[in-house]
Amino acid sequence: MTTKPESRLLSFADRGPVAKSYKKYFAKASLTFFAAMILGVFLLPLLYMVDTSLQHPDQRTVAGSPVYPAVARQGTYQGNTYPIYVVPMPDGSTKEMMLVEPGRVQSTFVDPNDASQTPVEWQGSWRTLSQAWSFNIDFDNFTTVWSQLNFPRMLFNTAAIAILSTIAAVISGCLVAYGFARFRFPGKNMMFVVLLATIILPFQVTLIPTYIIFTRIGWSGTWLPLIIPHLFANAFNVFLLRQYFLSIPRDLDEAAMIDGASPFRILRSVILPMSVPAITAVTLFHFFFSWNDFFLPLLYLQSKPELQTLPVAIQAYNQLYVSEPTLIQAAALMTMAVPVVVFFLAQGAFMRTVVITGVEK
């Protein structure tokens, strides 16, 4: 009795899961590729900054120099130093040779690996040849910026202003957000709407009035205009903290009140310990804003160079060394080092908080 051979073709029902798995894999691969492309676009300026800051200043002035940090190769012949070029050989290959006697029609080269050999006469203009380069990282740009820019002083100014203003912003934001989240008083909702409306208020609208006020009270030329205004809560910080405070059950407040805790004690012992992710996010947001702020320090500290921050100092440094991109990029890279380190140390709490909504947990 003969049996019918089993068909190797998958039925429609069998092909369904396979097709779905391939479709799911293709969707994930496409999403990953698209995300990598976007990431590359954002990382390209950073890669340019790192690459340029590690190059020797002379490399930027040589035509045909590589994009990576490198130094032009040189060799010694009879006690003198000569550049090395990539020379085409008669057999079609290329070889690195040391140019000892340049000429328009004929040039003399010597093998840099064996200078005792007879010099080679090459027919052609040496200017058409490519110079030989070797990978080389130059850290002198950072030491130059450190000394010329008075970097330690500018770093101290920037850190002091950023830390003090961040402390002021976090304290004021927590107090105001706690009032909107836990207390009942007439006009609370209207006041909160007005507070949120200040987010869309252009910065230029309040710039001139605040500048006139701070100048008349003698704050111009000091750090006070960069710190004191943050004692009056920022609307964005209040909104973010209030939404998080609302997600904390009121039962905890009532339990603390039964034990005799005051409203301030509830804030300090119940609300704040449970709101570490939100407070961390507000701290990072404001710290980065204050660290990168350029206009306000320029406006209020222009008469006091010793009190200026790094962004303002880098702008002045750029005007002096506009033809030295390696120094400018080194200064920018050194300036962004602190925010990058701070972000990576607190990225866990930060990423948990950026998705906060008004929905209770």
For the regions a protein language model found, what residue spans apply to each?
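A structural signal for multi-pass alpha-helical bundles of membrane permease subunits
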Residues: T3-L9, A19, K23, L31, ...
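Low-complexity, charge- and small-residue-enriched intrinsically disordered regions
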Residues: T2, D14-R15
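Anchoring transmembrane alpha helix of integral membrane proteins
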Residues: A13-D14, S30
